[in-house]
Amino acid sequence: MKKIFILFTVLILSGCASLFEGPDCRYTEANLKKVSKSELAAVIGFADGSSEITSENKEILHQVAKKALNEKAKVVVYGHASHRTRTQNILQRIFINLKISNERAVKTAATLISYGVEATDINTLALFDSRPIRVEVDGAAEAANRRAEIYLYWLE
């Protein structure tokens, strides 16, 4: 299931509407069939409305970067947001959460790059509040959903 999720993520990031359109997508398809393994390397949390990387999370990302470099892994960073915003307008909520989840993914990737991971080895995807890991019935659940997930994957 993780390989399929990574496959579709890379397709989305490469701008491919399907596996069979255009030469760039054929190249992507050929490479994606060579993904041999993927794993969740880390999940880092964020304060409400923030995309700042804490010192604790910097250390976690430093360890992820070391592993990616030592094992020649590629990286996908998924940015997430909690559902709650200060607006009831659904389009504004989506826009706000898309923006913050993108900032979280990009800043996480930038931190990995600062630790030596090549920018060309990292993809980011903003998932706004579309994939909560907890139902938001309290502040702890909201906090759990404000996160970035960092996956490593290896090509054969």
Positions of predicted regions on the chain:
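Periplasmic peptidoglycan-binding/anchoring modules of Gram-negative envelope and division proteins
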Residues: 46-85, 109, 113, 150
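Short glycine/serine/threonine-biased micro-segments
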Residues: 13, 77, 124
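Acidic/histidine-rich, surface-exposed loop or edge segments in extracytoplasmic proteins
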Residues: 37-48, 89
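Periplasmic OmpA-like peptidoglycan-binding domain that tethers envelope proteins to the cell wall
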Residues: 83-156
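Extracellular/periplasmic catalytic domains that process cell-envelope and extracellular macromolecules
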Residues: 36-38, 68-70, 141-144
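A generic structural signal for alpha->beta connector loops
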Residues: 13, 72, 119-121
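N-terminal targeting leaders that direct proteins to extracytoplasmic destinations
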Residues: 1-39, 50-52, 57-62, 149, ...
